[in-house]
Amino acid sequence: MGRSRGVPNSGDDETNHRSKRRRVASSGDAPDSLSAACGGAGEGGGKKALYHCNYCNKDISGKIRIKCSKCPDFDLCVECFSVGAEVTPHRSNHPYRVMDNLSFPLICPDWNADEEILLLEGIEMYGLGNWAEVAEHVGTKTKAQCIDHYTTAYMNSPCYPLPDMSHVNGKNRKELLAMAKVQGESKKVLPGDLTPKDESPFSPPRVKVEDALGEGLAGRSPSHIAGGANKKASNVGQFKDGANVAKVEDGHVDRSIGVKKPRYSADEGPSLTELSGYNSKRHEFDPEYDNDAEQALAEMEFKETDSETDRELKLRVLRIYLSRLDERKRRKEFILERNLLFPNPLEKDLTNEDKEVYHRYKVFMRFLSKEEHEALVRSVLEERKIRRRIQELQECRSAGCRTLAEAKIHIEQKRKKEHEVNAQKAKESGQLLSNTKVVHKTNRPMKIESDGNLDQKKGGASLDSTGRDSPKTTGHAGTKHWDDWDIVGFPGAELLSTSEKNLCCQNRLLPNHYLKMQEVLMQEIFKGSVAKKEDAHVLFKVDPAKVDNVYDMVTKKLGTNEEAPTV
């Protein structure tokens, strides 16, 4: 293999090639300060990842080497390559690449060019946010250093998303190394305690890069670098493996890694997630509109053996899927643009009738702009208000009012009278409910729990624990006080004749129960299963006397004989 690695790396060839570039110590033509810094980091990490020649096993880390483009992870030194050395399966006629030594500073004095490449490769491989793996891929930098460098040099660059290369354009390797060496020497004369602002010479809006390079603030050791990164950690969030960080007020950072986004206050309205499942950080709904759009092509794949018809069909499925995504995007943008996730301030002061009109007019939002729709709704509500006022004035004129003062008095009296009528109705309904409590039971008749005094004094029918009416007081007492049982207002009362109403009052039956008993009796009589009163007793869990009375009414209406009804 081209190098020895402490941790084996799995994955495709491209990942192996990139992982091979991981290094722990920088060597070669790098200045002493950089070598010491990288060496210190390597010793702290305790991992070795050096390149070596696959033929002579010579250490070629930090030197120019020849990399085979065909054989994976295969390197040769210049001497072995010059004599055409071959190691199975490598052959001397394989294509190759010349890998130059990149151990020189480029963007920052404390970051070499090869470390920059490893940083970007690590972010591409492990994702932006998996900084522990990225730092391990770089090998010579800590997690905090990687975050701080990427935030400063890339995210906050004036040339975003590219780093600022104006201070190195036109300079060769020797000039860059000399520049880093000068900065390393000037670091010794600087005071040890620096403020956070002085330790950020590579932030273009605050300190010019040329001045920073001249002052030599960047040639500090990794310990100082880590300390500076910790001091600036408030701009990039709290790190799990970082030390105690000091928060620094800095309004410069506009693009940062790990910064908490501002939350919506309670005054701005209900939470987005509570209303619709909208995630403001991802700008997505959960679930999305047409959430099953991806299922149509989840298992679809293009194969070389596909015919033209199959290929055209798959392309059409893709076009349909894209149109569904466009509709999903349109709806989401429409909701966010119209601010439909929060209550409209216009709706707060509306009456219930006006709110109903407001909601009915929401269907026209898709055809109008936001301003046009609000103007339409306001005009409709204003029209309703004017129409109500005109109707009130017409009623006042019909009542004989001739001035606005008289009309105002008439309207107040009318409202007062309506209020009294409503209060009287509510009082009557409350008395009715207090006298009789209706309890609905599933699949059996409704039970009536009357006041105990009425049951005892007026002969009301009581219910035993089995659901059957107790016949002890249902007889003549119920007939004597039948007028006390008023069924007016109960559902189904308007469907009964006078004789049927009297029957319900005498037997203390609800209209719905009577109609149901009548329906069942008619069906059974037509079937022939009920020929006399005793046959109907088993059909209902009520007092047999009530069943007999209902049976008599049904047979009377059918015009049949009580004992032998004709069908």
UniProtKB/Swiss-Prot annotation:
Pfam families membership: Myb_DNA-binding, TADA2A-like_3rd, ZZ_ADA2
Coiled coil: 288-308, 405-429
InterPro entries xrefs: ADA2-like_ZZ, Ada2/TADA2, Homeodomain-like_sf, Myb_dom, SANT/Myb, SANT_dom, TADA2A_B-like_dom, WH-like_DNA-bd_sf
Record-listed Zn(2+) 1 binding positions: C53, C56, C77, C80
UniProt-listed GO biological process terms: chromatin remodeling; regulation of transcription by RNA polymerase II
Cellular component per GO, a single term: nucleus
Nucleus as UniProt keyword: yes
Location of the SANT domain: 106-158
Primary localization: nucleus
Residues given in the record as Zn(2+) 2 binding sites: C68, C71, H90, H94
Top-level taxon of the source organism: Eukaryota
Keywords: Coiled coil, DNA-binding, Metal-binding, Nucleus, Transcription, Transcription regulation, Zinc, Zinc-finger
Extent of Basic and acidic residues compositional bias: 446-458
Residues in ZZ-type zinc fingers: 48-104
Region Disordered: start-end pairs: 1-34, 444-480
GO molecular function per UniProt: chromatin binding; DNA binding; transcription coactivator activity; zinc ion binding
Tissue and organ distribution: Expressed in roots, mature leaves, stems and panicles.
SWIRM domain segment(s): 476-567
Chain's role: Required for the function of some acidic activation domains, which activate transcription from a distant site. The exact mechanism of action is not yet known. ADA2 and GCN5 function to acetylate nucleosomes, opening up the promoter region. The ADA2-GCN5 histone acetyltransferase (HAT) module is recruited by WOX11 to regulate crown root cell proliferation and stem cell maintenance of root meristem. The ADA2-GCN5 HAT module together with WOX11 targets and regulates a set of root-specific genes involved in carbon metabolism, cell wall biosynthesis, and auxin transport and response.
Assembly notes: Interacts with GCN5 and WOX11 (via N-terminus).
Protein name per its UniProtKB record: Transcriptional adapter ADA2
Gene responsible for this protein: ADA2
